[in-house]
Amino acid sequence: MLLRTVSSATAETTAALISKNTYLDFFKRSTSISHLAQTHAQIILHGFRNDISLLTKLTQRLSDLGAIYYARDIFLSVQRPDVFLFNVLMRGFSVNESPHSSLSVFAHLRKSTDLKPNSSTYAFAISAASGFRDDRAGRVIHGQAVVDGCDSELLLGSNIVKMYFKFWRVEDARKVFDRMPEKDTILWNTMISGYRKNEMYVESIQVFRDLINESCTRLDTTTLLDILPAVAELQELRLGMQIHSLATKTGCYSHDYVLTGFISLYSKCGKIKMGSALFREFRKPDIVAYNAMIHGYTSNGETELSLSLFKELMLSGARLRSSTLVSLVPVSGHLMLIYAIHGYCLKSNFLSHASVSTALTTVYSKLNEIESARKLFDESPEKSLPSWNAMISGYTQNGLTEDAISLFREMQKSEFSPNPVTITCILSACAQLGALSLGKWVHDLVRSTDFESSIYVSTALIGMYAKCGSIAEARRLFDLMTKKNEVTWNTMISGYGLHGQGQEALNIFYEMLNSGITPTPVTFLCVLYACSHAGLVKEGDEIFNSMIHRYGFEPSVKHYACMVDILGRAGHLQRALQFIEAMSIEPGSSVWETLLGACRIHKDTNLARTVSEKLFELDPDNVGYHVLLSNIHSADRNYPQAATVRQTAKKRKLAKAPGYTLIEIGETPHVFTSGDQSHPQVKEIYEKLEKLEGKMREAGYQPETELALHDVEEEERELMVKVHSERLAIAFGLIATEPGTEIRIIKNLRVCLDCHTVTKLISKITERVIVVRDANRFHHFKDGVCSCGDYW
């Protein structure tokens, strides 16, 4: 009897086990929600409704198939879910783009149960906070993980590092990484990727070097996919070739995506033939490989080849996805190719995807097709934060700063809140416009959102203050930053250069070198610019030579132009000419224009004729060269020749850009043109000018009229310079502000000699500091003296 009972119990247990294993097998093989629902019914029918292992597996499978709310209902049916089931549901919500719900499940676990979260629980919670872009929640969860002693687990550590990078908290990410007792390949890859995505390419490469040199961890294909874009951005061809060799040795090279990464690398380094050779190694290129090669051809000027390859892609029958188009659009720098892609998107209804329309908006803006960009933005049925950022950035890049600011204010009324990308774009617009009050308002917004910890936002703030005339505030913010990248240093150097403070710029440059930051070609450009506006010939010469011989950089046309400017402004015109003739590359119009400007400063008419002939050959439709040459002749009192140059420009219908000056009172910008009569306070403005004129005459002022039109009477010429836009703006500033208040104005053209003299006198008469930003630099007028030393 006992034997029969035992046998019966064993049989029932075996049947139950077989049945349970069968259900688990069903879950693995199920590819539809309806199939899983039928299996669920069978589980209930056969008495397994409370089997937590089966229900957990069912919840996981439903989540994988997107039936997250069905999965949630199963979770709710379990009377006492364990931590593993909580983890499964949290992961499911995150995977199905419901990070907020995942955080709610985590909160329920902590507050309503006696269960203790494990490292996986925290990893999923951190991932959810990152997905929901909840910086505060992420930091709180991190703190809870530390208290529970889970933060040293590798999966959790990688998720925390990834989250901090996503929130632009680069220093926090680095601290977590450094404190991890062990590091695996995933963690190293997360650091490399995080720096790269934050555009900190030098740091990304350094982490990669540390992985190779200091760690016993092996790199994998993901490592290469993360590091290659950083190497490409810095155009580090030699390092790229070393990584290519390493990839071959480690067996990672055979991966198609890695091969594609090398195509992009060589293309960005200008080695398009090497990229093309790699592309031919594909038996059947995928869409990503086509994208990389099309980009390579486009960025290297091979437009016909890029169009041909795009047609080949279309004829291949490949079905493009929205993600493919998003990656393809930004790299296509030719308008005809963009039209082709845009047409395909219209035909295939891809414009309904916010990511696709945003990508097209971005590329149209880069190609100066701003109206097409705005039309796409307005017609987009589903706007996103990136789409707002793309349009604001587009306006800023095209110099339409007022439109950028207007759209930013419109965005604030929408459901979207600005992120650091938005803030950086709008600060750039403020800098271009010279709108200090608006820039300060944005700075206040930054403080309220905790974006100041972002290295990019802080750098943008430094640039804004420098370009709006407040170099002291720019330096204060610079000194407060605990972490600086090469862009931060470059911005501060450039700011000092813009204000004519060359020695301060050099001091920052040497401080940068001492801090261990490697200068880039842009760094040298900023330093040379600063030297040119401070008359530092010897220092500029040394910097230029060190760039070539010590750091191995090949000078660009811009570097050569800066050296010509340094020599030319100092009066070394023949040496500047010899320097141009010895250049290893074609000088180009910018270099010759710089020398022509030096001819104007030092009144070398003969050399000016020779240089202008070169310029008229290179760029015959540039009215600026004609105006500059005419002014040189006028300064030499060769009025007939000046008239001939002007008549030539007139016959060619070349129009000079009208001059204007902006002054900001409160947060309201006021714009003046020469002889402007449109301002509501025009009567008071001209009366103020008349009073100032009398006081200046008493001080011995004589108008500089030699550059005014020679074919009018002297009295009329005096009147012409008397109503220049900067004088009207200064007069209005004197009326609209309290005595002793600093006046700041922005002029779109170079300030003329007479207005420069007048502004010095006004600063002395009114006992005001007057800051003028013209097309070249800043002038700080105080007590009758200008910071430029009359050297501009």
Swiss-Prot record:
Keyword terms: Repeat
Segments for region (Type DYW motif): 698-792
Keyword Acyltransferase among UniProt keywords: no
GO biological process: cytidine to uridine editing; mitochondrial mRNA modification; mitochondrial RNA processing
Pfam family, one: Eplus_motif
MF (Gene Ontology): RNA binding; zinc ion binding
GO cellular component terms attached to this protein's record: chloroplast; mitochondrion
PANTHER family documented for this protein: PENTATRICOPEPTIDE REPEAT-CONTAINING PROTEIN
Protein's recorded name: Pentatricopeptide repeat-containing protein At4g30700
Source organism of this protein record: Arabidopsis thaliana
Gene (UniProt): DYW9
